[in-house]
Amino acid sequence: MDAHEDYVWPRATSELILLPVTGLECVGERLLAGEGPDVLVYTLDFGGHLRMMKRVQNLLGHYLIHGFRVRPEPNGDLDSEVMVAAFGSKGLRIVKISWGQGRFRELWRSGLWNMSDWIWDARWLEGNIALALGHNSVVLYDPVVGCSLQDVPCTDRCTLSSACLIGDTWKELTVVAGAVSNQLLVWYPAAALTDDKPVVPDRRVSGHVGVIFSMSYLESKGLLATASEDRSVRIWKVGDLRVPGGRVQNIGHCFGHSARVWQVKLLENYLISAGEDCVCLVWSHEGEILQAFRGHQGRGIRALAAHERQAWVITGGDDSGIRLWHLVGRGHPGSGVFALSFKSHSRPGVLKAVTLAGSWRVLAVTDAGALYLYDLEVKCWEQLLEDKRFQSYCLLEAAPGPEGFGLCALANGEGRVKVVPINTPTAAVDLTLFPGKVHSLSWALRGYEELLLLASGPGGVVACLEISAAPSGKAIFVKERCRYLLPPSKQRWHTCSAFLPPGDFLVCGDRRGSVLLYPSRPDLLKDLGVVSKVGAITSAPGAGSGEGEPSLAEWGPMSTLPSLHGKQGVTSVTCHGGYVYTTGRDGSYYQLFVRGGQLQPVLRQKPCRGMNWVAGVRMVADGNMVILGFHANEFVVWSPRSHEKLHIINCGGGHRSWAFSDTEAAMAFAYLKDGDVMLYRALGGCTRPHVILRESLHGREITCVKRVGSITLGPESGVPSFLQPDHLEPGEPVEPGSEGPGLIDIVITCSEDTTVCVLALPTATGSAHALTAVCNHISSVRAVAVWGVGTPGGPQDPQPGLTAHVVSAGGRAEMHCFTIMVTPDPSPPSRLACHVMHLSSHRLDEYWDRQRHRHRMIKVDPETRYMSLAVCELDRPGLGPLVAAACSDGAVRLFLLQDSGRRLQLLAETSHHKRCVLKVHAFTHEAPNRRRRLFLCSAATDGSLAFWDLTTMLDQDSPALEAAADLGLPFQLGSPCLTVQAHSCGVNSLHTLPTREGHLVASGSEDGSLHVFVLAVEMPELEEAVGGAELLPQLQVLEEYSVPCAHAAHVTGLKILSRSLMVSASIDQRLTFWRLGHGEPTFMNSTVYHVADVADMDCWPVSPEFGHRCALGGQGLEVYNWYD
């Protein structure tokens, strides 16, 4: 551990933070957002949208910003210059800003004033500022000099949970304090006869049964709103609070939140509340819920602001997201459910089915065989035709397209299908396709060129009809093109179909949950070279499309994914962007693609919680995707991007006839209820006119951070070049992304919210872009491991981008393996696109159920958690990498990845530690003229480290590989090569670095200590081997040092950067650098970061001009950089 050169002390600077948004304030046409100690400034552009203007870093030091107060100007002009007080915790700072003409300049900044108590509210009073402190006192402060002018306490020196200051002068200043006794205390600081003499409360207001977290006063109407822990919002009639002795009356008690209410704001016509349930509710002053905004994830909405003139509501959440919502009248017009009044004496029969032809025409059929049309422009019902052959049992489907192409199809229980032109129903065409019941109908449309109708009959036969129109447009031609045969099942009919571009294939879903691939034209099979894979069976006589017509061959599927969506069936198939999206009643939707005429699953995703019936997928105008489905008795349109329920219709559930249509002009949903047709229609289509000012990261704590690699983008990717500093005027703002492409680091984070997120972190802009999220886990994700990092196309044909294999693991002993491919894409703001392919998954309890010898095994506790992962890449050809997992049940398990990650199986295990294993770390040892040795280090809650030699276990004749081939009991690793008692309690961080002497090993513990030692690997001489047997290497500790009080809390991150430098991170929120090489590690310097409860850290070198980067994950994400 000798240092050969003096090391320059690194100075870490914060480059990026993604923390809960705790403060929001609208100032004229600008928005101020507080994120940690930083301020984000947004400005309103000419298009009426907010855009990012500036980030002011570290304004409040080590305090979190909880609020802003703007000093009112005599002329009311806040568009050019403004004086802002930012406060939070015990800190206060005043800053004067110039932001006119789109340029941001900081003119003056006061010192950071530290108060003696928590600041709950602040208010400007004639150049000074009044502060309401945490134990029911008020301080009048001079922000320029930085001194207290007056300090007046209340006689009730209780702890406050909130406070509100009212008034413009010291004489009329009123304090409304929310005490821990659940009361509101109203008192007047100016009533104090002398300074520091307590003031008796003027009024005490009771009503809530929990502490009060927020309050808002509307002076024009004399109303006060309070939000409480009891999940309610109360409205009080208080009159002018600046006048003592007034009467307080509770005029509203609003229940609508399912958890604690954090924030409340009173407007002239609305009351806005937001809480721990991640819902923002808009109320009338009478207590009626007018709107509900859902989209944030995690533990709630922490900040709330409103812009009355623009009719905006802005929310900031624990998920680091900022969202802008439109109030009623500006946001979501034309929505609502209304009955179409079908019941009439002139329309006999009972409605059996309903469908939509576009978004403004409704079709319905009765049990009398009558087909009716309702035009939303004419607003009346019209009978198109009546056919007694379609009474009792009748199917109805309208052709897809903006206005349904003016076609619909009927089918009955006798094998008859009728294709009806809606505008000329007398030109309907009848066909008898089957000798029995038609089970289902579906349409398949290829642009405006080809339209097919598929009908399922008895025996799994699907007739494919080609529909074309006459040149006059008044007649249609229907021709049976071919027949398909479904795989055998109990309920043997198809449920949906779609063309796969460019149109050579049809993708179908069936009732047993399978996804099938058929040729759209059987005569194309010869050109595709897949004739031998598809069987053709001649149909039985009499099963043709008409009397005397020749029988058609029934073509089997080219590719099948059996029971992909379980036993409830596939509900929709959609093709977009080269992928196939399927949905089902198993509560999931799949992304598939076709390669070589075969269907291959890419990714399985789940929509919002509780949507067990996923009905469809739609691509909207902005390029995003929305999911349709049923959540209990409600039909829901859900956005995966914003995690928001865009539309909610209480229809009674999906076990009824319903139809959905979406165009850019409007969205429509029709369903049958109480013998009538109900229609929900919303102008503007599926989308909602709200703005995501900043994307969410994770809804819960980040548990692991792992850097994958880096990508360099240039002008060919549509990214502008670097701007030289002399091209910018002093103080000119730099747009995010305009600093140039530079280097972009790809980082993977996982969280307690069960998601794995892929982030792009540009080195030049100090921003973060969420590329994609993987939501396959059913419980929290605790660890991520990466291997096989490369470029698209492989070494032979490298292309711009990055590819990698990823393994994620966490709660419920669940592990998933997938690949990511990040490629340049000029469309999104990140200039990158990320494609994910799920390869395999593994759960210990499911693995146990499949074993033949499970009676000889102890069933694994289903609550077992994987705490840490390590990938051991092998040099043996034909054998995939090993994944080592630290398990909470005291075991260390080794999994073998085969077939490029598509097979994941348990290979070996050991229960040496007999207690929860917290960390695993793999490293290799290479000696001259010797084989490469693979070692694994594991650490447990007793502070011990165990070292295992995995090389011998992976030999050609190893019993571990024989057990893997036999899929029997996992191989037992036995005893470790070396055990080191490094700490007195759990080891939360572990890292190694190869040196000339062996390996430098460092660990950090829950007691805040560090342990560093040199591990020597002694290889036996070749002459010592007798009879060709290989002698095992000997491990021993050469030097060993400990730092007992390196941190004040758990050390959760540790990285040996070089032989002379180490960096550690702890829950005490300090990033500390240590000098190695001179005995005990020596403290160099420390930087305070703002992420609370840090769970993991990753560091990597970037380049000589950018130095090192370090990502810290906990309750948020923060990225630091330093230069060597």
Curated annotation (Swiss-Prot):
Record keyword Acetylation present: yes
GO terms under cellular component: cytoplasm
SMART domains on file: WD40 (SM00320)
Keyword RNA-binding: no
Family membership: Belongs to the WD repeat WDR6 family.
Its job: Together with methyltransferase FTSJ1, methylates the 2'-O-ribose of nucleotides at position 34 of the tRNA anticodon loop of substrate tRNAs. Required for the correct positioning of the substrate tRNA for methylation. Required to suppress amino acid starvation-induced autophagy. Enhances the STK11/LKB1-induced cell growth suppression activity.
Protein name (database record): tRNA (34-2'-O)-methyltransferase regulator WDR6
Annotated GO MF terms: enzyme regulator activity; tRNA binding
Keywords (A to Z) from UniProt: Acetylation, Cell cycle, Cytoplasm, Repeat, tRNA processing, WD repeat
Repeat region (WD), residues: 53-97, 105-143, 147-189, 200-238, 247-285, 289-327, 335-376, 381-422, 425-470, 476-520, 557-596, 602-640, 643-682, 743-789, 852-897, 905-950, 974-1015, 1039-1076, 1082-1124
Chief site of localization: cytoplasm
Gene Ontology terms: biological process: tRNA methylation; wobble position ribose methylation
Protein's organism: Bos taurus
Modified residues (N-acetylmethionine): 1
Cell compartment(s), UniProt: Cytoplasm
Domain of life the protein comes from: Eukaryota
Subunit structure: Interacts with FTSJ1; the interaction is direct, and required for 2'-O-methylation of position 34 in substrate tRNAs. Interacts with IRS4. Interacts with STK11/LKB1.
